[in-house]
Amino acid sequence: MAAGKPFILENNFENSSREPLLRLLERHDYQAITLTLTGDYRRIYERFLLRNAGPERHRGHVVNTCYPELPGQPAEAPLTYEQFVDGIRARGMDSFTANGPRIVVDTTDFAALDVPGLVQRLARCAEEILQAQRSPEK
């Protein structure tokens, strides 16, 4: 931000992240576009379980108690569907918005995503932000 360049900041943003992020955005006079990836919670939960069970998933992203796991330690049970959804809602992951436009993308079916349309929406939002920054009223 100090360089004044556009950038992408990717994270599972949640309510606890909002105030510190807003302070940074204000300090550096940035407006952020929030891109919320959501969809049918059941389908997302199923993908979550598959990803966590896969060999390519680093165990540090799966284990919430102690990593590396202690020898002989029983495997941690995966979150239930209800715990998964409650976590999303309680942490504000589906409602998080920074200080600018918010685009909600349904990722239930990846094949149905309109990627070119999404890129156009992002470009329009970015251009509107840049135009507002250049306006004499600012």
What label would you give each PLM region?
Residues M1-T38:
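Glycine-rich phosphate-binding loop used to anchor ATP phosphates in small-molecule kinases
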Residues E14-N15, Y41-R42, A112:
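Alpha-helix N-cap/helix-start and coil->helix boundary motif
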Residues R18-P20, E46, D114-V115:
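Short glycine-/acidic-enriched loop or helix-start segments at secondary-structure transitions
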Residues E26-R51, V105:
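Conserved phosphate-donor/acceptor-positioning beta-strand/loop module used by diverse small-molecule
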Residues R47-N52, V119-A123:
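Short, surface-exposed amphipathic charged segments that create phosphate/polyanion-binding patches used
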Residues G54-P116, E137:
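Small-molecule kinase domains that catalyze NTP-dependent phosphoryl transfer to phosphate-bearing small molecules
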Residues A112, V119, C125-Q131:
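C-terminal alpha-helical "lid" subdomain
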Residues C125, P136-K138:
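Charged, low-complexity intrinsically disordered regulatory/assembly segments
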